[in-house]
Amino acid sequence: MATEAAPPRIAVRLPSTSVRDAGANYRIARYVAVVAGLLGAVLAIATPLLPVNQTTAQLNWPQNGTFASVEAPLIGYVATDLNITVPCQAAAGLAGSQNTGKTVLLSTVPKQAPKAVDRGLLLQRANDDLVLVVRNVPLVTAPLSQVLGPTCQRLTFTAHADRVAAEFVGLVQGPNAEHPGAPLRGERSGYDFRPQIVGVFTDLAGPAPPGLSFSASVDTRYSSSPTPLKMAAMILGVALTGAALVALHILDTADGMRHRRFLPARWWSIGGLDTLVIAVLVWWHFVGANTSDDGYILTMARVSEHAGYMANYYRWFGTPEAPFGWYYDLLALWAHVSTASIWMRLPTLAMALTCWWVISREVIPRLGHAVKTSRAAAWTAAGMFLAVWLPLDNGLRPEPIIALGILLTWCSVERAVATSRLLPVAIACIIGALTLFSGPTGIASIGALLVAIGPLRTILHRRSRRFGVLPLVAPILAAATVTAIPIFRDQTFAGEIQANLLKRAVGPSLKWFDEHIRYERLFMASPDGSIARRFAVLALVLALAVSVAMSLRKGRIPGTAAGPSRRIIGITIISFLAMMFTPTKWTHHFGVFAGLAGSLGALAAVAVTGAAMRSRRNRTVFAAVVVFVLALSFASVNGWWYVSNFGVPWSNSFPKWRWSLTTALLELTVLVLLLAAWFHFVANGDGRRTARPTRFRARLAGIVQSPLAIATWLLVLFEVVSLTQAMISQYPAWSVGRSNLQALAGKTCGLAEDVLVELDPNAGMLAPVTAPLADALGAGLSEAFTPNGIPADVTADPVMERPGDRSFLNDDGLITGSEPGTEGGTTAAPGINGSRARLPYNLDPARTPVLGSWRAGVQVPAMLRSGWYRLPTNEQRDRAPLLVVTAAGRFDSREVRLQWATDEQAAAGHHGGSMEFADVGAAPAWRNLRAPLSAIPSTATQVRLVADDQDLAPQHWIALTPPRIPRVRTLQNVVGAADPVFLDWLVGLAFPCQRPFGHQYGVDETPKWRILPDRFGAEANSPVMDHNGGGPLGITELLMRATTVASYLKDDWFRDWGALQRLTPYYPDAQPADLNLGTVTRSGLWSPAPLRRG
């Protein structure tokens, strides 16, 4: 049999490629990487220094040639410079007996304002002199007779940051002066004496004389936009950075390895645990509590569009948020669609889902086979992630994007290590830099960048032998600096430096060694130290401690990848250290650890499994520590911020169900420790079983044997059930959950639709049955109750500084709780029953009698039984289901009662029943006592008041006005969406339809209303916004008088929801000033003057 010969083998000689030839093949990429990378970095670094177009604004007065007051509240409080010229003859309008009521020729603040002399400039008549007062300093004074004489020409005044000076031109100092015969002038220096400007006000009228001039240069250094040169440089810088990264990618491909898929296999599949996490996050998006700063951030975002830059609206004299404002700019764009809470927080929900996707698809598989295959690790990771995210990240603060940024930075570093390529390192630098500048707490992301140094050095060392160092480093340098372009796109280097120096000087600016304050707050029984927040942090610390201990003891956690797990641990430790350098110390900053908490939870779950920790004793001790963490966490309140707290069980007390939960958990801790001791002394085996369990039982046992997973999911269940129960128990009254669910149906105005406002309390007064209106209040019995039995000052008791709350304080360390108009006082004319007490809420003294039990000197027992007042019909009661009595004093609820009767019972002098009032408000100030009409039988036709004051302490007294049934309208109907409103920063998210007053070109819009949170919230946030901090309160208190309007929360009548104040200008006829605008080009180093610091 013939065989076929095999074909001869032909050896093919392939061309060899040397390192030098390979470098030549990538020469273009190398050149592009070097040139584009270096130029991109240079342009990014130069961006803050490049010129901008600044809009200038000049406030000139008189306007329209007349003596007419104008409003121009400067957001920076002071002008960069101020020049005033007043002809001497202009003072003639202040002279003579016919002008006794006219005292101010010109001022920068209304003379009626409480702090007018302390803060502003007033050119006024004092007795027979004309005095120029600047910030409580009489700068120059001249007799009015000399001012109106022939020698006096004009008064000039100039103000700059370093000095202020004034002179009466033509007048000289008198013979008794220090320098007789010298020009009559005054000067102050060594301090910033520039006066605060909220407008130009005068008591004079008519045409303005020639030569009268007021010219203030408004500080508009932040009202700027990029010049064409800067815009071109920024565009070119981004393009060159992109080109450098493309070149770096080409150099990366020189290793000959095929491209690895970017997304993990089956990344789109959803399992049972994924479904549970998604369901919890979505439900929490609707019913969950928000963070305290959501209103702060939302208002900044809403106002920024009209303002032209992202100013810190509530503090620091309107300086910009940059370099931390880019995330808020995205929220400002998002707010164009809707300002409803569920819409504004939609990006936060997307970040939460992305965080879990990254943890479950990227982090857990990279931590090693033991973590990847452990169900306990997955459940613990999910529980830890949710335990941190739910209480800390369900709002508009930047912590969610920082938590996500830290995870993405770590993933990019790990991809760089796995592929030995540099492009992921460059991407990590971009993500890390954006995370770093998302907010002050972005400093926690520095750990994710630091852990990239080691892998970067290794890869650079390997690649530099082929391509050199510069082609590899230049693109990374460009990537690390490109974030300067969006940060400084419309601002200058000098402006940002001055803004940050101002914030540090004004404060709060706590030092690194003040970090203990954050943990003090964590262990306070307040929303800052609530059960949920305390457990989140303690569980994170426990997971970190276990992971570190096992890594140190065994070199690595058995079954885990050493490099990635060490880097996760390192990032967390560095992040905790970096948090020490944040200028404020609040517990919501811990939200940046949400992603790391899930990752560490997975590591800790593996670290305490039987495979890694074989000792049953040690595993039991760990379980005892977890139970102790639960006990320590439940030694607090289940409290949340502001409206999120409505209806929440145990919101003001430690949880208790038949017995104290914290005590029960502590006892359980002792029992588990006794079990650990038994394992140590008696059953000291490792506890491993030889029988092979079923797959289901193995999974169940793995989860049950992970106490951290059980604890975290119990807390998650507790939080979700608490807030869901709050929504159910509050219904039909307002709650966060109800409001968010209704927003799906188009009802997006939040609390404004449920707050009922009583504009005219006089209209709802009940009519006396028999006695005259003036006498009815004391017609039954009046012993020691008199029309003037009320102290002149009934200001609410101040609240002392609470431990740990040292970030914001006023000058005396006290925060008073009185609402404007409720602090009492006296009137010149007596009221209907002879009382001179000043009444709150626009009550008319001519129609409202008042009786009180207080007297000067020794107190005596007092009793009051009013006459009968006619109740409305049952149909009318349904339309206004509340009875109100305005009262003042300090008394127990049982000491003031409401009695009802039928006509027959009243005629016989008997009552058919009685009830106590709900006392909502701050004692001893005026407040509205409430009683639901539903508690009064439908057969009752008359009511009367009964008060009994047997306490003889001087501070214990009662003052009452007649009962009334309020006629109310919703706050949305009263305030509307058009009026400018001063929204306190706690309420911004709850009132999304109200328009916050804006600012533009350095001048604030004048608000007509102010909405405050509940008393405790108002006391906490008002110091943030005051004059010392450069906030809007320092403007409104000079420009307007605030009056509290009576208001109630629908179907939740006894709730202190907050307050509505009407803001009335001291000069009602003053119009907004017209500014003279212009545009100039400024360099990045230009500064007009120092920023005002107080």
UniProtKB/Swiss-Prot annotation:
Region feature Disordered, mapped onto this chain: 817-836
Which Gene3D superfamilies does the protein's record reference? 3.40.190.160, arabinofuranosyltransferase like domain, EmbC, C-terminal domain, subdomain 2
Single GO MF annotation: arabinosyltransferase activity
Q: Name one Pfam family in it.
A: Arabino_trans_C
Q: What is its EC number?
A: 2.4.2.-
Topology with regard to the membrane? Multi-pass membrane protein
Which cysteine pairs are joined by S-S bonds? Answer: none
- Protein's name according to its UniProt entry: Probable arabinosyltransferase C
Q: What is the lineage of its organism?
A: Bacteria, Bacillati, Actinomycetota, Actinomycetes, Mycobacteriales
State which gene encodes it: embC
